[in-house]
Every structure is written in C-alpha cells, then in structure tokens.
UniProtKB/Swiss-Prot annotation:
GO terms for cellular component: cytosol. It comes from Bradyrhizobium sp. (strain BTAi1 / ATCC BAA-1182). Pfam families: DUF179. Belongs to the UPF0301 (AlgH) family. NCBIfam families: PRK00228.1-4. This is UPF0301 protein BBta_6966.
C-alpha cells in the first residue's frame, strides 16, 4: 500500500475528474453494482461492487465479494513490515479476521480500505456517504493492527475502473443492476453470500436468476 496520502485524490481524479466527494445528481456514488449473467466479463462474474466515485468522466469502485487468493491480513501486515513474524498472536480479533479481497483488475498491487465513518484521516480519507469511507494510506493498517482502527473495515487489492460513459453503457446493456448500499452487506463476514444478498435487496430471487441464465 502506497503511503502517499495524495494518491487517493489522484486515483479519484484519474477516473472521475473530481478531487473531493460531492453529490452529483444522476450518478451512482455510494451505490452497489450487481453483475448480471449477461455481463460477459468473467472478471466480474457474480460480483458486487461498491461505487466510490462516479461522474461524467468515469467511475471507480471496489469489489466486495471476491477473496484475494490465499493471503490473509496478518500475512500482509508482515509483508509491509508493520508487524514481525510471531506478533500475529498479539493482534486484536478485528485484525486477525479482517478480510483481504480482490477489489478489481486495476492497480492490483495497491490496497484500498473501505471502512465505517468512525475513522478519518484528514487529507487521506474519502467520505463516500454517511456510513462508508475509503482510505489508502498505510496509517489505517497500523491503526487496525493496534486495535485503534474503524469498527468495520475490509482491505481490497486493486479496484474496478470505467472510462467516461462506459458504466452507463454496461448498465443500459443489462450488464449491471444497482441499488442503495447496505453497510451490513459491504462489511459482512460471509463474502460468499453477498451476491445473493444483493440480489434479494434489489428484489430478485437468486434461484430464478440462475435458472434464467441456464436457459439463456
């Protein structure tokens, strides 16, 4: 994770042209995207993505239901020299069990922490809505390791990005549905259940969707 606090704004500006968070009528900041069977991109099959930024210039989001391989949070802390081997036993439960997810195919070597709004670093934390923030500095990982971090958090490696107009086209082509974000769903422990939970939130029976996809 790059410790440069300015990178958060740089990433946001890169894909949206906006440096700070503002509300934009018609855009989907702070909503969930739920992939449909007609998506056609295996990288996003059955994915649930939290949209951190959306404007006329593009969009960026974090996938919240795809584990990042075999690495766990304590191993990542050791790789970043935040803790040493053997210190894992002294980590708080919140750090020991924190999820490490694949956030998307862009910048997969970088970490993005989605977290509850009870933790905030000036000039480093992006407030997306009243319940969810995004921080990309190493300071939040140190705080979590010490038990001083946010109440709810997940670490994602990489993010999903769309050029200007691309997300709108994919939604129009029925590749995505979207709905209001639910912090309990975003930060829930059962990663494998998030897709079905998101479908039910929209009002879709997951079984019916699976059957329809099988007969497409």
């Amino acid at each position: 994770m790059n410790p440069d606090a300015k990178r958060l704004g740089d990433v946001r500006r890169k894909v949206t042209g906006i440096g700070d968070h503002t509300s934009h009528g018609g855009y989907l900041d702070g909503q969930l995207l739920v992939a449909m069977p007609v998506m056609g991109d295996s990288r996003f099959e059955r994915s649930v993505i939290y949209l951190c930024a959306h404007s006329a210039e593009g969009a960026m989001g974090i996938m919240v239901n795809r584990p990042a391989g075999s690495i766990d949070f304590p191993q990542l802390l050791m790789q970043l020299n935040i803790i040493e081997k053997g210190d894992q036993i002294s980590l708080p439960d919140s750090a020991e069990t924190m999820k490490v997810l694949s956030g998307g195919p862009v910048d997969t070597g970088r970490g993005f922490v989605l977290h509850s709004s009870d933790y905030f670093i000036a000039n480093a934390t992006l407030k997306i809505n009243d319940g969810v923030c995004l921080t990309t500095t190493i300071d939040i990982l140190k705080a979590i390791a010490k038990g001083n971090g946010p109440k709810h958090a997940l670490l994602a490696l990489g993010y999903a990005g769309w050029r200007a107009g691309q997300l709108e086209e994919e939604i129009q082509d029925n590749g995505w549905l979207h709905c209001d974000a639910d912090p309990e769903l975003i930060f829930g422990d059962n990663v494998e259940d998030k897709y079905d939970l998101a479908l039910r939130k929209i009002g879709i029976d997951p079984g019916m969707l699976s059957n329809a996809a099988g007969h497409a």
